Amino acid sequence: METLKRPIKKSHNPMISEDCIKYLQYRIQQEDLSSRIYLSMSMWLNNEGYTGAAKLWLAYSKEEATHADWSRTYLLSMGVTPETASLEKQPTSYIGLPQIIRDSFDHEIAITKQIKDMATDAMKKGDHMLYELCLRYLKEQVEEHDKTQTWVDKLAAFGEDKVGLRFLDNEMGGD
């Protein structure tokens, strides 16, 4: 009987720097964290009757998980096994939809700062591969910021009373 041979293991690509690996591991953790934050918000919104907003925040959660997969896929293509970091438990209750909108906006600002700092560091070190990846994330952050800024602006325009929040919820759900 012929013994099964182990598949060929992909070698570590020397083009990827240790800084790049560390950053991408961190990026995976942060994108997974963002996904879990938005998932937690979505579940709370759903239980509070904000079905439109719940649907939107669930879509945000899935989008963030996709962003984590960008880095995972890249690391795997370079022969590096991505780490699966443990993440802290997320809140299960919120003050209301206005808090979720503002918290999401603040969260996206913090994520953008992380990515900008890493892009600056990559430029200084001449790590062109890492810089290119940072640019991909920064382009995505322009969209993320625009989305959350739109909801902050609409919250200010429509108000935080029940009628204004119901209108926002309907708009978030595409109704």
Cite the ranges covered by each PLM segment.
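Iron-associated oxidoreductase/ferritin-like identity signal
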Residues: 1-175
